[in-house]
Amino acid sequence: MVRPADSSVDAQRAREQFLSAGALQPDAVAPSVLNSWQRSRELQVHPDRVDLPYLRDPDTDTPLMHAAAPVLRRIAEDLSDQAVSVVLTSADGLVLDRIAADTEFERILDDVRLARGYSYAEEFAGTNGIGTALETGQPAFIRGSEHYVGTLGGLACAGSPIREPVTRRILGVVDLTCWARQADPLLFVLAKSAGSQIEDRLRTMNNETETALLDAYLKQSRRYPGGVLAIGGDVVLMNRYLRQALDAADQTVLLDHAAELTRSSFTSTTVAQLPSGASVKISAAERIMVGVRGDSVVLHVSVHVAESIPVRGSQHIPRLAGRSSSFRRSAHQVERCYRDREWVVIEGEKGSGRTHLGYSVARFVTPEKTIPVLRIGDFETPESFVAAFDSETDDADFAVIVADVDELPDEVLHPLAAVMQTRAGRGWIAATTSAERDSQLVDMLMLPFFIHTVTVPALRHRIEDLHELVPMLLNELSRGEARMDAEAMRQLAKLPWPGNIAQLRHVLTETLRRQRSGVIGADKLPSECRSVTRRKLTRLEAMERDAIVRSLLENDGNKAEAAEALGMSRATIYRKIKDFGIA
C-alpha cells in the first residue's frame, strides 16, 4: 500500500508552518516527528540543505558487521528489482555499509551523503529514519516532508535499532530507504524484522564465542599445571589452583591486570604485584576468534609467593606515604635488600614512585649517608654519566640508584656494565625500570647483576593510599596551608591515574593554583579530574575536554547552556561528555 498523496501534502504544509512559526496544531504530524523537528531546530540543523561531515572510515571487522552482512545481502537480493537501499550504521549514525541495486537511486543517495563514512545522526541530518531511531531508541519510519531537511523530502526511510543481546546497548541501526512516493508500511515491518534477525545472529555468535572460550579453557586446564584464567565479555573462568592460591583481594587485582592484557593487541605477557605480596606472571595462551575480532582470551597465570617478611607496623619511613599491604611489602622488600647489601631492580609503571621508594628506604636505614640518584637526562654526554657512576661507586660501601635503566641509550649500556662488573659483590645498587621494557640489551647486560626484583604497584592498584599521599603532597606543596575536603577526595579516588603519583602531584599543583590555602572542594580540581575515561586523550581532545568542563562549571552544570556558550550543538556536547568520561 503506497501512502496517500494528501498525507504527503499535509506533512509538507506542517513542515512549512513549523519552520515559519516554530509551532504546530495538535495532530498535524505524529508526536515522534514533531519532537524530532524540535530537536533538529535546537541542534541548529540547516532545514534546506544536507550538510554532513565525513567522520571516519568504517570499521568493517566488528561483531555488528559480521552479524549483519548476510541479513543485509539477503534483503538486498529480495529487493533487487526495487529502488530500495539497505543501510547499516553504527551507534553514532555512521554509515557502515550500503547496498542498492538501482544505480540511479545510488547516485541520489550519494548526493545526500547517505554513504559510507558519513553520519546520519540527528545532530547532522535532522529528522530521519536512522538518527531518529538512535535518538529515541525505537524504530522510526520517516516519509517525505517528515524529514526536517528539505533535500531529503523525496525519500522515505525506515530504521530499526540493533541492540546488544545481553546489555541491550544500542550498537547501530538497520535502515531501508526508498523513494517517498513508493513508501509502503511493509518497508517498516521489513526493517524491524531485519533488526531482529541481526540481533539473533549476534546472540548466536556470542554463544559460539562463549562455547569456544569454554573449550579453550578446558583444553588449557588439562595441559597447564599452573593457574588458568579465561576472560571474554561477561564470562570469567578461573581454575581451582587460582581460587585456592589467591584470596579475594588478590583475585580482584589479577582480573584487573588480566583485563588490561586482554584488551592489548601488542602485549602478550605482564607481571603484577598482588595485595598479599605475591607476584603473578600473566601470559596470553590462546585468543578466541570465532568469525569476529574479539577480546576473549585464555591466560596462563604463574603465581610466585613472596617469602614471609615481617611487617613492622610501628616503623614509619619518612616521606614514604602508603599503608596498602602491597606497597608496604614492596617497601620492606627493598629495605631488606638494602640492609643485606643485595642489588635490586625496582620495577613498575612510570611515575609510580620507584626511585622515590629506593631513595627513601636507603635514607631511612642510613640517614648519615648521601644516596646519589643518577638519571641520564641530568648529564650532557653518555660518557659523563658513566664517569659519574664510576666515581659514585668507587668506595667499598657505596649506595647509588640508577633511574630508568630501560631508557639508557645503547652506547651507555656496555661501558656501564663493564663498571658494574668491577663492583660486583660490594656496595648497593638499585636500578629502576618499567615492568614492560622491551630492551633485550638491558635484559642481557644489566639485569644479571641484580639478585632481586621488587615491583611497585601502580596507584590505581593501591587507591586507598590516596588518604596518605594527598595530605603528604599537599603539605609539601602548600607548606601545610591546604587540605582536601571529602568530596574532592572521593573524586580523586574515582580516577584511573595512568600517570600514577607523578600525575597526582601535577593535579595537586594545578589545584593549588586555583586555591592556595584552606579546605579545597571538588570544584577546584583541574579539568582532567572530571574525566574518568581510561584511554589517554590526544592533546587536542584534552583541550576540548577542558573547555567543556570550564563551560559546565561556568553554567552551573547546565549542558544546553554550556553547549551554546561553546558554539556546539547539544547532541555534540552530550556525546563528548560521554566520550571523555566527564563526571
Curated annotation (Swiss-Prot):
Keyword annotations: Activator, ATP-binding, DNA-binding, Nucleotide-binding, Transcription, Transcription regulation
Segments forming domain Sigma-54 factor interaction: 320-513
Keyword ATP-binding carried by entry: yes
Single GO MF descriptor: ATP binding
Keyword match Ion transport: no
Residues involved in ATP binding: 348-355, 395-404
GO biological process: regulation of DNA-templated transcription
Pfam family, one: GAF
Function description: Acts as a transcriptional activator of the mimABCD operon encoding the propane 2-monooxygenase complex.
Protein name: Propane 2-monooxygenase operon transcriptional activator MimR
Organism: Mycolicibacterium goodii
